């Protein structure tokens, strides 16, 4: 475990910070959390960012595993500077009360010209506004100039651009500029959990559709 939180605290925290991601609470006794700038290399551990600033989540605790069996490249990336901080691969921030908020995976951050956009706050805002079970916020385009595209899961809709009303509601709800809103009958998820969205596949499909290519997804 890294953090702990009661349901009542989740509810009160999310009222105060509606689109901050998922509040997972204060670090448990013996665990340390550090939020560092996105995209740092494996040579050293950067200084933490300020409260409220999004970055990558590092964790240090006596019970954190010392390595990945047989995965040397993964081990090197996960332990920057050969220290005891572990790169979780998640992104988030710490609020003024010291609570940790998770905003998604580092691999899923949209790297746009206006700064990084994390997936979970966007998806939660869209799902709340439209009453959906699933959506995916992905980046299309080259790193540093990616455009934010939202793909919504609508079982009765055809794959392709969402209708004008859906587009307007998404753009009104999301705090970042949304380049396009697309619909699919279903989003690709892992077979084991039926929960983890394959955002790489969604981003590749969105890129193809917006370039005038095949609309039917291949999942």
Task: Show where each model-derived region lies.
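AMP-binding/adenylate-forming catalytic core of the ANL superfamily
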Residues: 61, 66-67, 83-84, 89-177
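Catalytic cores of large soluble enzymes that bind and process phosphate-bearing ligands
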Residues: 16, 25, 49-52, 60, ...
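Short linear motifs in exposed loops
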Residues: 31, 104, 120, 192-193, ...
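Conserved C-terminal "lid"/linker of ANL adenylate-forming enzymes
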Residues: 136-138, 149-150, 167-219
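Structural beta-strand/beta-sheet cores of well-ordered domains, especially the beta-sheet scaffolds
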Residues: 29-31, 53-55, 133, 146-148, ...
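Conserved AMP-binding/adenylate-forming
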Residues: 1-92, 96-97, 106-108
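Non-catalytic alpha-helical coupling and interface elements of nucleotide-dependent molecular machines
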Residues: 38, 131, 155-157, 207, ...
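Short, internal active-site loops enriched in acidic
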Residues: 39-41, 141-143, 185-189
């Amino acid at each position: 475990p890294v953090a702990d939180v009661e349901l009542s605290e989740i509810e009160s925290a999310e009222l105060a910070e509606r689109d901050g991601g998922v509040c997972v609470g204060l670090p448990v006794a013996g665990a340390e959390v550090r939020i560092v700038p996105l995209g740092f290399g494996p040579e050293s551990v950067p200084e933490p960012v300020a409260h409220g600033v999004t970055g990558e989540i590092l964790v240090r605790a006596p019970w954190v595993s010392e390595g990945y069996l047989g995965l040397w490249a993964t081990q090197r990336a996960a332990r920057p500077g050969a220290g005891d901080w572990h790169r979780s691969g998640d992104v988030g921030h710490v609020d003024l009360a010291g609570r940790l908020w998770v905003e998604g995976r580092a691999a899923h951050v949209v790297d746009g010209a206006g700064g990084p956009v994390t997936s979970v706050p966007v998806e939660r805002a869209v799902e709340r506004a439209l009453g959906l079970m699933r959506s995916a916020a992905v980046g299309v385009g080259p790193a540093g100039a990616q455009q934010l595209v939202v793909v919504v899961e609508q079982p009765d809709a055809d794959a392709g651009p969402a209708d004008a009303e859906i587009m307007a509601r998404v753009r009104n709800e999301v705090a970042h500029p949304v380049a396009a809103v697309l619909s699919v009958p279903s989003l690709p998820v892992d077979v084991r959990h039926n929960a983890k969205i394959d955002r790489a596949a969604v981003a590749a499909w969105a890129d193809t559709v917006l370039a005038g290519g095949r609309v039917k997804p291949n999942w």
